[in-house]
Design a protein with these regions (language model features):
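Non-heme di-metal
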Residues: 38, 42-319
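Amphipathic alpha-helical packing elements
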Residues: 1-36
Length: 319
């Protein structure tokens, strides 16, 4: 491992390890009572919870498969691999968290786990991600030519900028907004930890993409730039459709039009993070509290159940 070529990758591995958490540490009692009471949640709120658990339980498996079957094999730098292994563990924890929520709330598992086949707005997102992992997950796929190197780059953009960087944001915002209104606070706390992990995954992926561009400038030609921008725009459109489908009437403090603006704001960020121009002019962030959660550091979380920045693994420095 030493000397490190990419200090940023090792630092993210250390930070991710220090932020370790497990789903069963979070109390789900209030969520269970609320979910089972007849007038606890509106039908629209129930739809939001079920759709998101259905999408996320499938999506994190998709991300984990891509990491283990493709990226770990194709990215050979030791400290980047170390972080990819850390991320793989976190994806397993996230899948565990969704399962824990589904079981705690006594949901119909068949209904939830089949959404990626039966609910069109969920299915479209899952199949969009699959098309970018299919070829590079093949054990015979090798990088080393301009064409295959570009395929790897497209996979990184698809999974880090779009799947984790856009497809997760409507659902995170919906669930965390419910938590802010003191509804489904256990589920929202699980999602808060997951969002913190996912933010680091996205940052790692963007660092890898930008490092590949620096070391292989010939890959980042006009055609590739146009394709990368197109992928981010396609992902944004799919997520806007998902927002409209999960919020046909809106819920307190949030509706599909606000979510559309937020997703365009996020898309602009993803574009600029990989060196492309913003595509949506004049959009702002209608949910500034989301940025506060993503950037939360060393303070008690807004559900006041436990310290969000609690760390394990000897990461505290004693004076």
């Amino acid at each position: 491992l030493v000397p490190f070529k990419y200090d940023w990758a090792w630092q993210k591995y250390l930070d991710g390890s220090a932020n370790h958490w497990m789903p069963q540490e979070i109390n789900m009692t209030n969520d269970i009572v609320l979910w089972k009471s007849e007038d606890g949640l509106t039908e629209d709120e129930r739809t939001i919870v079920k759709r998101n658990l259905g999408f996320f339980s499938t999506a994190d498996s998709l991300v984990a498969n891509n990491l283990v079957l493709a990226l770990y094999r194709l990215i050979t730098n030791p400290e980047c691999r170390q972080y990819i292994l850390r991320q793989s563990l976190e994806e397993a924890i996230h899948t565990h968290a969704y399962q824990y929520c589904i079981e705690s709330l006594g949901m119909d598992e068949g209904e939830i786990f089949n959404m990626y086949r039966e609910i069109p707005c969920v299915a479209r997102k899952a199949s969009w991600g699959l098309k970018y992992t299919k070829e590079i997950s093949n054990p015979d796929f090798k990088t080393g030519t301009e064409e295959t190197d570009k395929q790897l780059l497209k996979n990184l953009i698809a999974f880090y900028c779009v799947l984790e960087g856009i497809f997760f944001y409507c659902g995170f915002t919906q669930i965390l907004s419910m938590g802010r209104r003191n509804k489904m606070t256990g589920t929202a706390e699980q999602f808060q930890y997951i969002l913190r992990d996912e933010s680091m995954h996205v940052n790692f992926g963007i660092d890898v993409i930008n490092q590949i561009k620096i070391e292989n400038p010939h890959l980042w030609d006009e055609e590739m730039k146009a394709e990368a921008a197109q992928m981010i725009l396609e992902g944004t459109e799919l997520e806007i459709m998902y927002a409209r489908d999960t919020m046909p009437r809106g819920v307190l403090g949030m509706n599909a039009a606000m979510m559309e603006e937020y997703l365009k704001f996020i898309a602009n960020r993803r574009l600029t993070q990989i060196g492309l121009e913003e595509e949506f002019k004049g959009v702002s962030n209608p949910f500034p509290w989301m940025s506060e959660i993503i950037d939360l550091r060393k303070e008690k979380n807004f559900f006041e159940t436990r310290v969000t920045e609690y760390q394990v693994g000897g990461a505290l420095n004693w004076e």
